[in-house]
Amino acid sequence: MKNIINLDQGVIGALEFFSKNKLPKLNLDQFTFPIVVGSGNAYNTGQILFSGRKAIVADESTFKKTIENYRDLINKKIIKEAIIISASGEKDSIWEIELAKKYKLKTILLTCSPDSSSAKIADEMIIYPKVSEPYTYNISTYLGMVLSATSENPKLILNFLKKLKIKNGFKSYNSYSLILPDEFIAITPMIDIKKSELFGPKLSLRAFSFGHARHAKFVIRDKKELVITLGKEKNMYFGEPQSRWQIDLPNKVDFAFILCLTYYLVGQIQKNKPAYFKNNIKNYCQDYGPKAYGHNKSFDIIVPGSINN
């Protein structure tokens, strides 16, 4: 699968794309107290978008229970909207919209797929452009949504990444940990998902906020684990001293910056290790991946981008 890029290349491509293509503006103030639902990193994107706001965030495993638990607030019109986040507009997002409608909630779909099954039944849509990417990557899909809310400049992020000097001996480590400023904790599960997608059981990749890192995450130290810390708070305790890398950040950064930086670093790991993802993604997309959803049709190994991509 030589045509499959690594994650870091996908980040650069997405930032270059958004530097040239306009995004819709996501005005979060229009939502007073929504239920936000998404699967995988769509769920984590919901956590990012509504961090610091009144919202209930659920995923495909918790949505049925969540919406029932808040039935009284829905009936009282305190909760009036369900925001469904789905890049593809397929899979779980279809029944999630149908369920929200049964509860008389207004459904707003955030998607990159205007012709999808969910797009046909949602009350409203916000459509995002995207680039072609390997299946599961979803860099441009969710990055576009985050940028539309934070209004960060993709060119500034791109310049930072292109100037970043990778630590000497980076590829010699056999495990990696990322420590993020506490305010960006919502990104840590996104890294964990990328670990599962790209490396499975083959490599250790962990991500914590500073606050979580203090809770016995580094009881066991190993000089072969590189601990990468982002931000001005110095890592004085986590990992072996000779196996730490501190990356200072600009004074003002937001979620899109941290998402791009962490994904870029994961891509650096990916390109320096065996091609676990590239060697397995074809079989996943053509066999057991779609079968888990009860589908016979294969997934696209390269998910097409927008028409203007």
Where are these regions (language model features)?
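A short, well-structured juxtamembrane/interface segment
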Residues: 14-30, 158-172
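Cofactor-/ligand-binding subdomain signature composed of acidic, glycine-rich
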Residues: 1-22, 281, 307-308
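Glycine-rich phosphate-binding loops that contact phosphosugars or nucleotide phosphates
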Residues: 32-161, 229-248
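Short amphipathic alpha-helical segments and helix-helix/interface helices
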Residues: 94-98, 166-167, 192
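Internal helical hairpin/lid segments
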Residues: 187-263
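Internal, active-site/partner-interface "lid" segment
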Residues: 147-172, 278-306
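Structured C-terminal subdomain patch of bacterial secreted/periplasmic proteins
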Residues: 248-291
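Anionic-ligand anchoring segments at beta-strand to alpha-helix junctions in alpha/beta enzyme folds, i.e.
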Residues: 25-78, 170-215
